[in-house]
Structure formats: C-alpha cells, structure tokens
Amino acid sequence: MTDRVPRVSVFMASYNGAAYVEDAVQSVLAQTLSDLELVIVDDGSGAPTLDILRRLAREDTRIRLVESAHNGQIGTLNQALALCRGTLIARLDHDDVCLPDRLARQVSYLEAHPGVAAVGGEMAFMDGVGRAIEQKRRDPLKRVRHAPLAFPPKQVFVSGSTLMARKTAWDATGGFRPEFKAAEDRDICWLLARQGRVVRLPDIVVRYRMHDTNLSVMVRRTQLFSQFLASLAAVAAELGIDDTVVRSGIVVGGDYAPSVAGYRALLAERYPVETYWLFFLARMRAWVLGGYADGAALAAAIQAHWRARPWDRARLVTWLAALRYTQRKAALTVAEDA
C-alpha cells in the first residue's frame, strides 16, 4: 500500500469468491490507466478467498485489503467506499471483470463533462466459468431521461459494476442504503442523479458473470420489490417528502405490502402509487408478487382500477399497452421471467 493519493479508487466487497476474485482483481490491476488504488474489504470469507487476496495484496501495493468480520453486502460496500481516496471512484463486484480501458474511458468522459456526476457503460455477459452468453444489446442511441415524477418514474440506470462517480457525489449520497440492498445499484443511481447527471455510455466496459446465486427466483422477486420501492423513495425525494418512517419499515425479503401501503398513504394525491403498482406488476409479469393468481386476474384488477380513475391521454396510452401485454401473457409466471 502507498500513501500517495491516487487519481482513481476502485472499491470491491469480497465474500467467499475464491473461484472468481483473482480474475476481478487482475482486471483492475491491468487497466491502461494505472494511477489507481483497489480497495477490497473482505466480508469474513474463509481461507481460500483470503489466501488469494493476501497474496495479491503482497504482489501489488496498489491494493488496500481490509479483512472484516461478516457485516453483509451493504455494510461491506459502505466500508470500502469510505476508504476510497481518489477524486473519482468506481465499483467492481468480486465476480465481474473490467475490460482493460474501462477506467480510462470513464475518467476521460467525466473530465470532459463537469456537469456529469456519474457514468456507467454496457456489459457483456458470461457464465460461471467465463463462457460468453449472448444477450440482446440495447440501442445505444436510445436516450432515457431522468424523471422521477413521470409515469412510470424514469431513471438512467447504471449497473453497479460499471459505475464510476465523483467522490463528492458519492459522499453526498450517504452511501448504499440497507433497506434497498436487493436493488442497491438502482437506489444509488437515484441518489447520484440528485447530485448531477448520470450517463450510460454505449461502450462495453465490464464482463458480468451470471451464475446460480444471482439467477434464483427468490432473488428475482426480492429485486423487483426493492426496485419498485426505491423508485417510490425517489419520487418522495423529488417532491421533498420525508419518507424515513416508511423506509425504516422495509423488511428485505419479507412482506412488502405494508411498505407499498405506506408510500400510498405518504404520497397520497401527489403521485398515483396504486396505478404505478399495478402497472409495475404488469410490465414485470410479476402478478404473484401482488397476490394475483395469474395474469388474467391482474388484468381484471387493472380494468377495475381503470374504470374507477380519471385518466389523462398520455397515461391512458401507457396503461392500455401494459393491459394488452398482461392479457397476452396471462399464462406466464414470475418464475419464468426470473
């Protein structure tokens, strides 16, 4: 480790990642931009992972390794983030791999665009052993605007492992929030967007690993609820409404219905929470999360809600599209969408 302040800090939370962590670390050390530090906080891993990390830290002084007692993902991420000294700070998960020019590209963009708080990029996908997985690329020319009060709320989303932001922006967010730990990357993007623009570049900057621990149906369901509630937290923040009480009641992986009801009451007529909730279930093909037996049951609920509520033209067009989609896909379940 060196006392010199680096240009860029990369932070990583590690937990029992012996099969992948060396590839992740080496991808940072091999960056074309070499003025960096890699802050790794290990979350109480066993010997195989720690042996690898200790060896790597001995071999390269740019690594700052902290061995911690088990504290969970959010606590470990925040501990690593707090140790970063660079004026620009990037994240990488312990099972993903940076492309060699990832940091150089993102630093160049942030230096050329002072109004941008954070920047991300696209990902290539691989399986547990590193084999490429073909994925449909999103249109890089499609512009998504940041609009928390739109219907539905619109977000420039940057996947966690591709994210780089200014240290000042990171500090202003207060870090990752544990109540949204199943969708912490979405929540942090909402928070960063309050500090400046968030930009998603069309360049592939990271290889993202897909394996059993991030593909399970239970993980998918928890992520969906967390994404929904994080967007409502962003709506509340945009409206200047304190949602601390509602957020403090969120039980990750538990019963989310009280939290949905809490935001419904908190936002009242300021935002159509019930309409958004039904729309979200339809768009995500996740009716079971709302207690509906199938897509047809959700479609019936949407129709009843539609008849009982006045509509403006733009919202009606969006809503009818979701309704038609739900009716066509009525036989699907959330498990098939996981």
Kindly label every feature range from the protein language model.
Residues 26-35:
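Short, acidic, metal-binding catalytic loop of nucleotide-sugar glycosyltransferases
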Residues 101-134:
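Conserved donor NDP-sugar-binding/catalytic core segment of glycosyltransferases
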Residues 20-22, 47-55, 77, 97, ...:
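Acidic helix N-cap motif at the loop->helix transition within catalytic regions
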Residues 67-84, 105:
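Glycine-rich, basic loop-to-helix element that forms the pyrophosphate-binding segment
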Residues 210-338:
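C-terminal subregions of glycosyltransferases and related glycan-biosynthesis enzymes
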Residues 27, 42-51, 70-71, 93:
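A conserved acidic beta->alpha catalytic loop
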Residues 89:
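Short aromatic/hydrophobic "clamp" motif used to bind/position activated sugar donors
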Residues 10, 82, 99, 121, ...:
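Conserved nucleotide-sugar donor-binding catalytic segment
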